[in-house]
Amino acid sequence: MSEKLYNYDVDPVETNDWVQSIESVIREEGLERAKFLIEKILKKSKITRANFFKCFFTSDYINTISSEEEVEYPGDLILEKRIRSAIRWNAIMMVLRASKKDLELGGHLSSFQSSATIYEVCFNHFFRSKNDEDGGDLVYFQGHIAPGIYARSFLEGRLSKKQIDNFRQEVDGKGLSSYPHPKLMPNFWQFPTVSMGLGPLCAIYQAKFLKYLQNRELKNTSKQTVYAFLGDGEMDEPESKGAISIAVREKLDNLIFVINCNLQRLDGPVVGNGKIVNELESFFYGAGWKVIKVIWGGKWDSLLKKDKTGKLIQLMNETIDGEYQTLKSKDGAYVRKYFFGKYQETLELVKNMTDEEIWNLNRGGHDPKKMFNALKKAKEIKDKPTVILAHTVKGYGMGVIAEGKNIAHQIKKININGIIYIRDRFNIPISNEDIKELPYVVFEKNSKEYCYMHQQRKKLGGYIPFRLSKFTNALNIPDLIDFKSLLKEQNKKMSTTIAFVRVLNLILKNHSIKNLIVPIIADEARTFGMEGLFRMIGIYSSIGQKYVPQDREQLAYYKEEKKGQILQEGINELGAASSWLAAATSYSTNDFPMIPFYIYYSIFGFQRIGDLFWAAGDQQARGFLIGGTSGRTTLNGEGLQHEDGHSHIQSLTIPNCVSYDPAFAYEVAVIIQDGLRRMYGPLQENIYYYITTINENYYMPAMPQGVEKGICKGIYKLKTFYATELKVQLMGSGAILRCICKAGEILSNDYCITTDIYSVTSFTELARNGEDCERWNMLHPYEKKRIAYIKTVMNSSPAVAATDYMKLFAEQIRHYIPSNEYHVLGTDGFGRSDSRDKLRDHFEVSAYYIVVAALNLLAKLNNINKKVVEEAIIKFNINADKINPRLA
């Protein structure tokens, strides 16, 4: 007997004997004894334990839920089919009408056609909308199916004909975005799901964050479900699979993945020589997820019941994806010959069926009843997440144009015969005369279809997608005076990282917002001096702490609790950033603003997970990113991979990311208080903050009077070293500001040059302000000229800027400073380990290099002799012929 007859019991009596024996052992002697016996048998038969259990990770290529287990469908299948067909049609027309304008707009037809049934079952029976109690279900729509969601919203009356006619035409403000983008459609889309892989990752941490809110008793999220709709090709992304074990660890029974297994990615089959459904089943099952397969539609049920030999299931198991795809690109006769014809037993099963009936044998993802039962089952699962693997056909219903074709994803245009085929396939009531105009289907307001759509959505609380732009209940933001302990001179040396921790401690004592603070750490709390928070506010754990921590007797012991406030995400920057994003958008998804602070090694932020931070800009996130241990020369012992000299270059690429590089404790306090005001005060600005802090301890002075505005704007004059009328300006940020001050002293004392010292908290904000002024002036030639803020602070004397970042960072402002002579020093090149002094000499940002740069500018203006520059180079022992550190 073939070993592939997995589902066919050749000897039920023997099977029953084995089952009864094992049950008896378990009952009388326990599971451990049963396990011992099974392992003994495996050893005796020389089958490895791994190979034995491997078979449990992949089941037969049939539905998880049998037809006998199914419940009746609760909706009107006929009406829903008419609605679904109209949505399919309108989605296609939207793309074709846009393509007709010949604007090279693009658009995707095939992905939604393969998943329309899946979505419609959800819209009619599952998706709960935002309500008075909670934020409703949170849905991560697969990016490429956006036209289908627009098509439904159009039929609901939520989008106008003008809007859908402007699909991918957004500049004039009345179009629809190509994919889900909250930035572009702030009252519609909640979550950006492109680039691919971000959807599944963010959905996991969104579900975790809902549990966090629930367990901390901040908000009731118990009825909410997070859905992530994904493509089987998308599952190749590391982000798609990388966090699935987290979902199991956190027991996220509020999370459902629905993977549209149409077997195709952009260019061709996902796994042509294998079976992607089996691969995904093994992967998720092995991780601990509940796996529900929806492989075959109801038209297969009678054949499977007739299959007494097990040959049909064997055939289904043996057929690989490349073959399944080819079968669906042909016809019924081809399927009869090359699929059923493989075995006499299976050919016999279909002998009384016509070719058309064989062709109409449907896949599970196109059967509403099968999908309903899968989703219903998924909602009932407790203590673990669920993945539904729905077998579909890419380009379903598009016939020879795209159905099952490798080119399906690229189809943007369809000829008239193809359009007629689609019309007939879905019984669209449009005449041959009208079809050339590519008309939309519209339901009359009193029609059965229109009423049914609204009735079903009313039952579920309202419409989806929907996004809340501003939170409802105002927050009381602490005033700057609440941080007074950090505004005065500090008694002992400290780093700006410790200054941040002290700011955080003060906020955590503020009665109005303390419970809204979400400290997020990727396993570096002790590095940043934050271990004191462990006991103070606890580390969040969905199951509490079931062990006595090793350091229980210590003041700052490792305290986990269900109501813990800290999100400790382990060595997992992607996960930590995803938690930050969930918290940073809670104001919208939950109408409950949370204030996240994610602190991490600055080089492992934008460089490592920049795609997520770009998505955060799209999603209108509000919160704080703290790039700790920053600066190329400041994290001195960690070397090339850790020393950050470019995160500010990366952060400036995100338009709504506001970046600062403070040098003093009072600057940190002012910046964070201003961020709280801007993001969570009456303005509710859609921005987020990136603040770099350092691990170097030094003297922290008191805040000079009246500098608050300058700190927030990006620059203020710190001090002046007076000497003669000969003058230069020195400017710097972060760790290098002290080198600037030392250089000013040398210039004043040794060279009799008056030196103005400026603390530049944000070169990026200064540059943006300058660009805004220049743009305004260009477009308003008769209006009063706007002046860049930096020009109101600095003067025309030669200027030198030095930072612990690439020169490009300070170069941003060259065009806006009032001086004609401006020289920038920076840390271009790879980092390395040594003392801070040696590294600053190596990268040419030490006080001595700053002095030489200032003297050189004065020599260029003939204010001093070049000999002075040469002598300074010799005096400071600078090797003028050493290799450029950028190349070293």
UniProtKB/Swiss-Prot annotation:
- Which CDD domains does this chain map to? TPP_E1_EcPDC_like
- Give GO terms: molecular function aspect only: pyruvate dehydrogenase (acetyl-transferring) activity
First-level EC class:
oxidoreductase
Tell me its cofactors.
Answer: thiamine diphosphate
Known function: Component of the pyruvate dehydrogenase (PDH) complex, that catalyzes the overall conversion of pyruvate to acetyl-CoA and CO(2).
- Reactions accelerated catalytically: N(6)-[(R)-lipoyl]-L-lysyl-[protein] + pyruvate + H(+) = N(6)-[(R)-S(8)-acetyldihydrolipoyl]-L-lysyl-[protein] + CO2
Q: How does it assemble?
A: Homodimer. Part of the PDH complex, consisting of multiple copies of pyruvate dehydrogenase (E1), dihydrolipoamide acetyltransferase (E2) and lipoamide dehydrogenase (E3).
SUPFAM superfamilies in UniProt: Thiamin diphosphate-binding fold (THDP-binding) (SSF52518), TK C-terminal domain-like (SSF52922)
Q: Return the protein name.
A: Pyruvate dehydrogenase E1 component
Q: Which keywords does the record carry?
A: Oxidoreductase, Pyruvate, Thiamine pyrophosphate
Which EC number applies?
Answer: 1.2.4.1
* Database matches in PANTHER family: PYRUVATE DEHYDROGENASE E1 COMPONENT
Q: Which InterPro entries match?
A: PDC_E1_N (IPR035807), PDH/Transketolase (IPR051157), PDH_E1 (IPR004660), PDH_E1_M (IPR041621), THDP-binding (IPR029061), Transketo_C/PFOR_II (IPR009014), Transketolase-like_C_2 (IPR055152), Transketolase_N (IPR005474)
